[in-house]
Amino acid sequence: MVQLNILTDRLFLKEMNNCNAGSEVVTIAPNGEFYICPAFYLDNAPNIGDLIKGLDIKNGQLYKISHAPICRICDAYQCKRCVWLNKLYTHEVNTPGHEQCVVSHIERNASWLLLMELQTYGILDDCKIEKIAYIDPFEKIEK
């Protein structure tokens, strides 16, 4: 089957497929210091440890999907949930910015449209993506 990356990724995912920076992976810089991800290193953010002292992530639970109130109830599974963008736009690593959510939901809805078309040909009949009437999860939460 031909794959269209972001659109087809959502068709085959059953749960979030984020980068998991800070919860499952970290970056080691050329100087031996650890960072949440390469973006934090390039942004000159404070390190989270080094090869000598080890890893020290303050409030590490905040990097986990279980502590991300918006993301943990979302089904835009292809979203990368970039914690650096979260920190940049909302000042919180576990809260996404408006733009990141909207882009991910536009991708998700395009995946839904693709799925509807494929299913008219009997392809991916067992796949299910619910139709939604919003592109920003904050709209859903505010209601």
Regions found by a protein language model. Name each.
Residues 23-25, 29-31, 66, 71, ...:
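Active-site lining segments that contact anionic ligands and/or coordinate catalytic metals
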Residues 1-31, 44, 96:
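Radical SAM enzyme [4Fe-4S]-AdoMet core and its adjacent flexible, acidic
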Residues 16-18, 22, 61-64, 91:
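Generic marker of residues within folded, mature protein domains
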Residues 1-10, 37-89:
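C-terminal accessory region of radical SAM enzymes
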Residues 73-143:
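Radical SAM enzyme core and accessory elements
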